[in-house]
Amino acid sequence: RSGRVERSRITKSILVIDEAQDLGEQEFALVKELIRCNEDMRVMAVGDDDQNIYEFRGSDSGNMKTMITEYGASVYNMLENFRSSQAVISLANAYVKGISGRLKSGPIVGKRSDPGHVRLVRHFTPDYEQAIVNEIVSDRSPGNVCVLTATNDDALVISALLNKSGRKARLIQSREGFQLSDLAEFRSFIDAVLEYNCACLDDVMWAEATDAVRRRFSDSGCLDLLENCLAAFNEEYPTRKYFTDFENFLLESQIEDFTRSKESEVVVSTIHKAKGCEYDNVYISLKGLHNVTDKERRMVYVGMTRAKNNLSVHFDNADIFTDEV
């Protein structure tokens, strides 16, 4: 707006906004300015206001509503769900009705025929982590397992109890400010690629850079992480490999995306850190959730919809679930 940015750098024909429900005040101001500077620009915003759980960072799903009202945007409801079983979808649909001011006009439609299983367990004492652990230890359902919690403290307690019970737990901890390119193995691969001074790498260059890192870090515990990352990138970009695409791929990825846990290992995480993930069997602990507003309801909804097959929700506050749910 001040004219300090060259016009050529802000001239755009198409703008795609992913996770639009997470737009904050500054990001939305940028979007509005780009629209002002490009009268014929097409804008596509993809988001789910039911999954806005980053209000503490300044995100506001109201910006999506503003795009509809101020710019006359067309709204397309994408209601098909290919992840979750019928039982999980039914619970999520019933629960999300309690959130006010929603944009979606209809229920989610499950596309899987699997019935799945849902269990709601109300506890009358606040210390029920051991009950969750006992259920996990005795459960023989196939597939991977994840425990999602409302707080970091609860995640630590459940992780410790699982390990004490003999069931190995992997605690997902916050890595704010951490990037995959900070790891020596990734940095070495990037340096090897940059030596070619080529925007688009052919298969030979890519293989040579990969082999160089393998030789240098043959004993590294993070080499598998790099290998998994490169395999995922190859799958997404099977023909042309541009360095800028790889840079963006790293920026958009998390270390958990390339960590292949064993099925016997239980992943323990807060709900906020698990957004975007999915697991066959999900246990949710809502300990400490007492003041239930729309913000908390959205968090619970995100936790529920991480489950693919089976879901078990443990809580001690009767206000979390209505009689209808």
Segments predicted by a language model, with ranges:
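Conserved helix/coil segment N-terminal to the catalytic DExD/H
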Residues: 1-10
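Conserved helicase motor core of SF1/SF2 NTP-dependent helicases
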Residues: 14, 21-113, 146-164, 172-180, ...
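Core RecA-like ATPase module of SF1/SF2 helicases and allied nucleic-acid translocases
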Residues: 86, 146-299, 304-312, 317
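Conserved interdomain hinge at the start of the Helicase C-terminal
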Residues: 123-142
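Short, charged/polar "capping" segments at the starts of alpha-helices
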Residues: 103-104, 319-324
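Glycine-rich phosphate-binding loop signature in dinucleotide/nucleotide-binding domains
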Residues: 9-10, 38-39, 138-143
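Nucleotide donor/acceptor-binding cores
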Residues: 13, 116, 143, 309
